[in-house]
């Protein structure tokens, strides 16, 4: 990223067991080695640091806070407190945690505006595939009238395997063995992950003021082999589709195999329909460590660019 004139100085990192802080800048290669060896960054310095995430945000000065804790769709914690505290301290925020946005997108945007900070979250939808940026920037000047897509790679992988002859239980086990399924499998199987991404898209792309309770959500637990066979006869495949066309819905639907949206495996795809440009489909990897890191770097560059304009 040096070619963009950006050399971030990381002054603090925390994980579930502790933290590492150095206001002059942490040595990132050493930090990674420590995490690999000990399972926590708290062993970075000779004196172990047990400072919590919220204490770090409150007491360590930084320009940007990057929030990467697990998504929680019950109360959005601890991510919600991390984000709001950072904003109140006039820190810009990058989040790949969907929970706070899914439950309180409108109020978080208002808080960012009030505190004159930049809030970026491109990694929450599509991982390394810039779905949010595409809709907001590449279709600038257009009015997007609706969109629909496959926003969860895990369920798409399971449904693809079912189309190849596996039972639901066998396909689920295979997905778990490959590490695709969330620790709380209901986030994938009941459509909650897709619903969270739908909320973020609806707010960001369509300027709707919605949260998770506004989504009519149905997962894939009740999809049977008969449903899969019936779809095949219709030259279709069953996919978990998140759609925004007046109503916000997540549900299994038959999609024609000739439709660009009908992707297989862990791929994500989304089709935006706009007033004058018709329908455009984006396909890409939905998640993964490197992909998520790529989205964070992209957001960091955007923040740098926006600050330079001020």
What are these regions (language model features)?
Residues 70-89, 96-136:
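Rossmann-fold NAD(P)-binding glycine/threonine-rich loop
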Residues 161, 172-269:
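Substrate-binding/catalytic subdomain of NAD(P)-dependent oxidoreductase enzymes
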Residues 259-310:
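ATP-dependent carboxylate/acyl-activation modules
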